[in-house]
Amino acid sequence: MILTSVLGSGPRSGSSLWPLLGSSLSLRVRSTSATDTHHVELARERSKTVTSFYNQSAIDVVAEKPSVRLTPTMMLYSGRSQDGSHLLKSGRYLQQELPVRIAHRIKGFRSLPFIIGCNPTILHVHELYIRAFQKLTDFPPIKDQADEAQYCQLVRQLLDDHKDVVTLLAEGLRESRKHIEDEKLVRYFLDKTLTSRLGIRMLATHHLALHEDKPDFVGIICTRLSPKKIIEKWVDFARRLCEHKYGNAPRVRINGHVAARFPFIPMPLDYILPELLKNAMRATMESHLDTPYNVPDVVITIANNDVDLIIRISDRGGGIAHKDLDRVMDYHFTTAEASTQDPRISPLFGHLDMHSGGQSGPMHGFGFGLPTSRAYAEYLGGSLQLQSLQGIGTDVYLRLRHIDGREESFRI
């Protein structure tokens, strides 16, 4: 039974569902003080969300529309105009596209089994999407630059509102783990939700970045990206985490096409590389606990060709056990021992939204890292594959398609 079939078309007096939904769908207002005035406004907004939760007709209509995905080449060569008309064109595209993509994801939440969909954390994320849909569809058509500037403010707000969605989904599904009977359904839901989120954030961030005049960039697209430099940035990040946890970190050697430069979008690399590097360093340190200050290097090889970019990360961390190899790409599987660390205090996925900066955090956690990285790579027309020699180490191959237009590319 799915969530919508149980919820029906609207709340009824005395319905037993209200206690189940709990505090996420209720807010008491007791006074008219300055603080409570804010609570009144929040209550009104959440009341609208609840109404929309039960009145899905507008969402259903939009969810039937197909998504219009752009190639990076289209984004790169859309050009700039002195009068700012490119910003209006981009803003109008977003205004049409974002509600469609969000409606598709709301439909995905409604397809979840009832017991999972009613988990308070999952329900909170569902509510975030409904609220975003409301705000986007309530915004009047963009007619001029003043409208576009207001729309940018809304987009920034929504990006901030949704910055913790990955962590919340991981937490909610971990809480619901014992109720999951169909692993394939959950994997499909997560693949779709996480890659859709990546696409939305790329498009939204690209539009905001079009307002900036940054050398070698058109929006979020770097016209002369150096794989070596972006790898070095995340090597430094991963080594700091590793040193904080283990007191030392493996050295990293980078070889191959180290001088390569080409147009590319750094954002997916900023999402995937930290996870792969943390895995390699953790495996290396934990397989050499007797000699923590004498550990083998992690070796990264860059291979650039006319079709794609390949990054191989090789470690001597003992490899992956045969019994685990088929499961490492499954959501919520992790080779790390269970930890009592509260994920809300130190979220594993902070780096996915570029908010971790230099802070230290856990070297392992929910078991979302590899499957999320795989989903992102496949969404971008590439792949993520592992070759493991148990007792020796692991090679991870990240393959991403070029965006220069010479070969067929992916769509965002």
Curated annotation (Swiss-Prot):
Residues that, per the record, bind Mg(2+): N279
Subcellular location: Mitochondrion matrix; Mitochondrion
Expression sites by tissue: Expressed in heart and liver.
Activity regulation, free text: The ATP-ase activity is up-regulated by potassium and rubidium ions but not by sodium ions. Up-regulated in the presence of apo- or lipoylated-DBT/E2b subunit of the BCKDH complex.
GO annotations of cellular component type: mitochondrial matrix; mitochondrion; oxoglutarate dehydrogenase complex
List of residues binding K(+): V328, D330, F333, G367
GO biological process: branched-chain amino acid catabolic process; isoleucine catabolic process; L-leucine catabolic process; lipid biosynthetic process; regulation of acetyl-CoA biosynthetic process from pyruvate; regulation of glucose metabolic process; spermatogenesis; valine catabolic process
Purpose of the protein: Serine/threonine-protein kinase component of macronutrients metabolism. Forms a functional kinase and phosphatase pair with PPM1K, serving as a metabolic regulatory node that coordinates branched-chain amino acids (BCAAs) with glucose and lipid metabolism via two distinct phosphoprotein targets: mitochondrial BCKDHA subunit of the branched-chain alpha-ketoacid dehydrogenase (BCKDH) complex and cytosolic ACLY, a lipogenic enzyme of Krebs cycle.
Protein name in the entry: Branched-chain alpha-ketoacid dehydrogenase kinase
Annotated organism of origin: Rattus norvegicus (Rat)
